[in-house]
């Protein structure tokens, strides 16, 4: 009798409802804002023989390397091993490949995608001038020892944002959602006329936060 073979890989459990949000965010950043234009998104129906794979998202990185986030589904939750969804995060280089944590995946993604503070921002902050750039991926810095320059720029960036309380906050929310509705209407009308508007640069909340990864 032939023995059964077990396939063991490190995975991170993900609530099922988060998987759809992950796919939507990747497609939005790839096709709408173009922040992830070079990223390859492979849905389940294009994966091929790996029926347990829900999707593959491949991030080309600097040099001859890339990061792959592979989502799995139908992983025997009835036996108590895993929830029905999980992801595997793998870093491939020329010489080796290894599984990495979501925190390190954020660092790798931030090294190639999403803007950060430029070198001249410290001088602008000292002179009291307005910052011309910002960090669109702050989650990637949380596992690193931040420099004093970075901490100072974060404080300046936060102080530049207006503080809203009480009725002012409610009014801002109403204006915000009204602006989103107007933007969607303008986008549809421009699309009907055959022109494509440019979307603003997006903030990426981080792999673990988007997927609500469970340890």
From Swiss-Prot:
Pfam families: Vif. It is found in: Host cytoplasm; Host cell membrane; Virion. GO terms for cellular component: host cell cytoplasm; host cell plasma membrane; membrane; virion component. The keyword 4Fe-4S does not apply. Processed in virion by the viral protease. It comes from the Viruses. Its main location: host cell. A motif (BC-box-like motif) lies at residues 147-156. Coiled coil: none annotated. Belongs to the primate lentivirus group Vif protein family. Homomultimer; in vitro and presumably in vivo. Interacts with viral Pr55Gag precursor and human APOBEC3G. The interaction between Vif and APOBEC3G is species-specific, which may play a role in restricting the replication of HIV to humans. Forms an E3 ligase complex by interacting with human CUL5 and elongin BC complex (ELOB and ELOC). Required for replication in 'nonpermissive' cells, including primary T-cells, macrophages and certain T-cell lines, but is dispensable for replication in 'permissive' cell lines, such as 293T cells. In nonpermissive cells, Vif-defective viruses can produce virions, but they fail to complete reverse transcription and cannot successfully infect new cells. Vif-defective viruses show catastrophic failure in reverse transcription due to APOBEC-induced mutations that initiate a DNA base repair pathway and compromise the structural integrity of the ssDNA. In the absence of Vif, the virion is morphologically abnormal. This is Virion infectivity factor. It comes from Human immunodeficiency virus type 2 subtype A (isolate Ghana-1).
């Amino acid at each position: 009798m032939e023995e059964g073979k077990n396939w063991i890989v490190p995975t991170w459990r993900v609530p099922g409802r988060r998987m759809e949000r992950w796919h939507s965010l990747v497609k939005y950043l790839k096709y709408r804002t173009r922040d992830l234009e070079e990223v390859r998104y492979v849905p389940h129906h294009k994966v091929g023989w790996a029926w347990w794979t829900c999707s593959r998202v491949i991030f080309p990185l600097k040099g001859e390397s890339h990061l792959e986030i592979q989502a799995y589904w139908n992983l025997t939750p009835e036996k108590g091993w895993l929830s029905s969804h999980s992801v595997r995060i793998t870093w491939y280089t020329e010489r080796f490949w290894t599984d990495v944590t979501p925190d390190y995946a954020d660092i790798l993604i931030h090294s190639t995608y999403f803007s950060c503070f430029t070198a001249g921002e410290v001088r602008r902050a000292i002179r009291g001038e307005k910052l011309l750039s910002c960090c669109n991926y702050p989650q990637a810095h949380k596992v690193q020892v931040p420099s004093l320059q970075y901490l100072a720029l974060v404080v300046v960036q936060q102080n530049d944002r207006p503080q809203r309380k009480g009725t002012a906050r409610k009014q801002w929310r109403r204006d915000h959602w009204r602006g989103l509705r107007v933007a969607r209407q303008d986008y549809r009308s421009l699309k009907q006329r055959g022109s494509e508007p440019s979307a603003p640069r997006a903030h990426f909340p981080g792999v673990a936060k988007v997927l609500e990864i469970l340890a």
